[in-house]
Regions:
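Ribokinase/PfkB-type carbohydrate-kinase core domain
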Residues: 1-23, 29-237
Length: 237
């Protein structure tokens, strides 16, 4: 089972033309547009390539839902269970790209990251309880956009047979979406800055942060390298 934030990744390819004569901004010429199902959907598609069955649990927006794109993007062995949130959009991240150098010029978030209301939280909690007993593994892709709260995280930690967690720090949640939200995780995927934020330590090495500070899990995988621990939770050199 994969549970996490629904994200639509939009790429707008534009040619910079120069500074506007009357405004302090760069004018661009539109060239092309690509839209992909990202976030929890991208993670589930990867998992589906090596697993027989994958279940996605998430929420999408009632406004600009992109449901057709999402459903057409998923592999055949993936089952989608999602709730539409009233008067909210599916999170869409629009990146404006200079195609000449494939450089991102700037990004626009179309989203509402307010927490789930009580009815939505109850729905998510029931789905976790329903599907956890039949799952070999639960993967959490927590991008910090309002899907998971303390209540549903607690249920995940109590019910998952094996819990793998990625808590991403991004421009929308800097400092508010840390791995320390999860009292239990069997497998954690964070990068060095995310580990530093979790223990409020800007300058120590990543080995010291994980080996000596309060990040207690069997294995941590970063985006740049892997760090393994022995049975005594000591860093293997």
């Amino acid at each position: 089972m994969v549970i996490g934030d629904a994200i639509i990744d939009e790429y707008l390819y534009v040619d910079p033309m120069g500074k506007s004569a009357k405004e302090n901004m760069i004018a661009t010429r539109f060239r092309d547009r690509e839209v992909f199902a990202g976030g929890v959907f991208a993670a589930a598609n990867h998992v589906a390539s090596i697993c027989k069955e994958v279940e996605i649990i998430t929420t999408i927006g009632e406004v600009d839902s992109y449901r057709e794109l999402i459903e057409s993007s998923l592999k055949k062995n993936i089952k989608l269970t999602c709730l539409s949130r009233e008067n909210k959009p599916t999170t869409r991240k629009s990146r404006f790209i200079d195609p000449g150098y494939m450089r991102k010029l700037f990004e626009v978030y179309h989203f509402d990251d307010s927490p789930l209301n009580s009815n939505e939280t109850n729905w998510l909690a029931e789905q976790i309880k329903k599907h956890s007993p039949n799952s070999d593994l639960i993967i959490v892709t927590d991008f910090g956009h309002g899907l998971l709260n303390a209540h549903t995280i607690s249920i995940l930690c109590d019910s998952a047979p094996f819990l793998a967690v990625n808590t991403q720090t991004n421009s929308a949640n800097l400092g508010y979406n840390l791995i320390t939200k999860y009292p239990r995780a069997d497998f954690v995927c964070i990068d060095a800055p995310e580990a530093q934020l979790a223990v409020i330590d800007r300058f120590s090495s990543i080995e010291k942060i994980i080996g000596e500070r309060n990040i207690d899990m069997a294995r941590i995988v970063g985006k740049q390298r892997k760090l393994d621990f022995n049975k005594n939770n000591k860093l293997d050199k």
